[in-house]
């Protein structure tokens, strides 16, 4: 695609500079586009806004809408730059395995980014519903991920946050393409060799060089693919550290950054393990590119193992998903309430946040109207106390669920970490491989 973007595509950055002056007067010209969309349920929430499902009434297409509050972004140059980068990157990428950009517009107080809606669910959720999962199935998935990353890297774009939660199916059919989503911290490099130095990513999937701030580029995405592949084949994550230094210690202790615990890895081929170790090379300059991994012996092998890995996968993946879902239900409602408290007037009725803001199975977040009717009778201190009590009760109803799921999840971790490694001969076919010394066990994610 031509490096030059259209006037409309480049205008968010320009219009934002004038937005403060407009906020007290009229809506920006692009706001008329909002009339095309009917908003539905809330899909997620963050520090600066929410993501909601919507329908384009002109085309009938379901879409995802990221809504960002300008007040929250005001004065935050880093986040504003990330917003402009995301818009620029989304408009440059056109690939069947990358979520498609649809539109953008703004109101006097919000930005709206419209993208393709992936209705088929997350990668690991789909696997849990299968009756069988083999290495052949894993390879098909990785070909889609690698194809997307190869294309991104050819455009000098680094995703920097590849993880299972950002790998989504477009629809529920068996033929649905898998797409890479969430380019919120992606960066467009000025050259093939440019390095970035500010840390970004998700602990457990982020490459070591990102955290040590030694400079990172395209190879950091390859590391993330290695971690995803590891979990794809065993059901638990390669690392369980919850702090940066613990993670760095975990992946640098021993000759290899990960171990293949038995019995979980007994039925996985050596070629698959070699693929993982190549992607998880601690030296980013020695990691293969996405194009090279597409030609890896494991990926192009015509006689892959057909052993059903699903029974072993389900225990780990199911505990992982239930724990994460419980935590996310709490986080979603707390984030939405915080956004209301910080940036919306108490009496303001804001359809962008009220309708459909409840996470499935969770306690409804407080609405501004819950206390507005009492405002004349209660002092500010009393109102604040009431809101705090209501929030605490809502949170308390969820905390037991989270703790229960966490205990199940940690039980899986303990089993994995207590198992011995596979015999050293199991990985000796690697170039320059030696018998792996005993070191710190690698365990599951937080």
Swiss-Prot record:
GO terms for cellular component: cytoplasm. The gene is CMK1. The active site is at 161 (proton acceptor). It holds the Pfam family Pkinase. GO terms for biological process: cellular response to oxidative stress; signal transduction. SMART domains: S_TKc (SM00220). GO terms for molecular function: ATP binding; calcium/calmodulin-dependent protein kinase activity; calmodulin binding; protein kinase activity; protein serine kinase activity. Residues 1-25, 349-380, 415-446 are annotated as: Disordered. Keywords: ATP-binding, Calmodulin-binding, Kinase, Nucleotide-binding, Phosphoprotein, Serine/threonine-protein kinase, Transferase. It is an enzyme of class 2 (transferase). The keyword NAD does not apply. Transmembrane segments: none annotated. Its EC number is 2.7.11.17. Belongs to the protein kinase superfamily. CAMK Ser/Thr protein kinase family. CaMK subfamily. The modification Phosphoserine is found at residues 357, 417-418, 420, 429. The modification Phosphotyrosine is found at residue 343. Residues 37-299 form the Protein kinase domain. Multimeric. Residues 1-23, 428-446 have a biased composition (Basic and acidic residues). This is Calcium/calmodulin-dependent protein kinase I. Important in cellular regulation. Residues 312-323 are annotated as: Calmodulin-binding. Present with 1520 molecules/cell in log phase SD medium.
């Amino acid at each position: 695609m031509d490096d030059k973007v259209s006037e409309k595509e480049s205008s968010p950055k320009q219009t934002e500079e004038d937005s403060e002056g407009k906020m007290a007067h009229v809506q920006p010209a692009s706001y008329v586009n909002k009339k095309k969309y009917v908003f539905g349920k809330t899909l997620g929430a963050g520090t600066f806004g929410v993501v909601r499902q919507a329908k384009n009434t002109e085309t009938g297409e379901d879409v995802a809408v990221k809504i960002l509050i300008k007040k929250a972004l005001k004065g935050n140059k880093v986040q504003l730059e990330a917003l402009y980068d995301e818009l620029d990157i989304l408009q440059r990428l056109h690939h069947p395995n990358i979520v498609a950009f649809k539109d953008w517009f703004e109101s006097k107080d919000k930005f709206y980014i419209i993208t393709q809606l992936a209705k088929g669910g997350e990668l690991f959720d789909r696997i849990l519903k299968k009756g069988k999962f083999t290495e052949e199935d894993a390879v098909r998935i990785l070909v889609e991920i690698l194809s997307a990353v190869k294309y991104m890297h050819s455009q000098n774009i680094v995703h920097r946050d590849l993880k299972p939660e950002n790998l989504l199916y477009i629809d529920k059919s068996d033929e649905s393409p898998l797409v890479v989503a969430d380019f919120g911290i992606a960066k467009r490099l000025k050259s093939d060799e440019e390095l970035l130095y500010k840390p970004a990513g998700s602990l457990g999937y982020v490459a070591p060089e990102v955290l040590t701030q030694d400079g990172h580029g395209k190879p950091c995405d390859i590391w993330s693919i290695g971690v995803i592949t590891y979990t794809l084949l065993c059901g638990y994550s390669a690392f369980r550290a919850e702090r940066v230094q613990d993670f760095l210690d975990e992946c640098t202790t021993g000759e290899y950054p990960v171990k293949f615990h038995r019995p979980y890895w007994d039925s996985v081929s050596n070629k698959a393990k070699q693929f993982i170790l190549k992607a998880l090379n601690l030296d980013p300059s020695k990691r293969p590119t996405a194009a090279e991994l597409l030609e890896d012996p494991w990926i192009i092998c015509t006689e892959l193992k057909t052993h059903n890995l699903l029974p072993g996968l389900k225990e780990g993946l199911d505990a992982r998903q239930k724990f994460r879902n419980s935590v996310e239900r709490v986080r979603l409602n707390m984030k939405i309430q915080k956004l209301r408290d910080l940036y919306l007037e108490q009496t303001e009725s804001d359809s962008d946040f009220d309708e459909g803001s409840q996470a499935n199975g969770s306690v409804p977040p407080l609405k501004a109207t819950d206390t507005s009717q009492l405002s004349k009778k209660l002092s500010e201190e009393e109102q604040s106390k009431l809101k705090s009590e209501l929030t605490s009760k809502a949170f308390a109803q969820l905390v037991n669920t989270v703790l229960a799921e966490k205990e199940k999840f940690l039980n899986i971790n303990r089993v994995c970490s207590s198992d011995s490694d596979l015999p050293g001969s199991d990985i000796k076919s690697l170039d320059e491989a030696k018998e792996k010394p005993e070191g710190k066990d690698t365990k599951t994610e937080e």
